[in-house]
Amino acid sequence: MSRVCQVTGKRPAVGNNRSHAMNATRRRFLPNLHTHRFWVESENRFVTLRLTAKGMRIIDKKGIDAVLAEIRARGEKI
């Protein structure tokens, strides 16, 4: 399963670890992903999404129906 938020589209970023001597070694910055089940009243079922903590805040703000409409408009199957 890919490490991509279904709401925000955030994916791993790359950068460097820096030691005290400022030596650079490559690393990945992973998104804060969680699998969460949401009850969708209009569909009378649960929907499971893999999303970041920011994605959860967006759902709190806009509502699950609006966010699902955006995801489906992008062509993702839910």
Curated annotation (Swiss-Prot):
Entries under SUPFAM superfamilies matching the protein: L28p-like (SSF143800)
Gene Ontology MF term list: structural constituent of ribosome
Keywords: Ribonucleoprotein, Ribosomal protein
Gene3D superfamilies xrefs: Ribosomal protein L28/L24
InterPro entries: Ribosomal_bL28 (IPR026569), Ribosomal_bL28/bL31-like_sf (IPR034704), Ribosomal_bL28_bact-type (IPR001383), Ribosomal_bL28_sf (IPR037147)
GO terms of biological process kind: translation
The keyword Ribonucleoprotein appears for this protein: yes
Origin superkingdom: Bacteria
Family note: Belongs to the bacterial ribosomal protein bL28 family.
Protein name: Large ribosomal subunit protein bL28
Encoding gene (name): rpmB
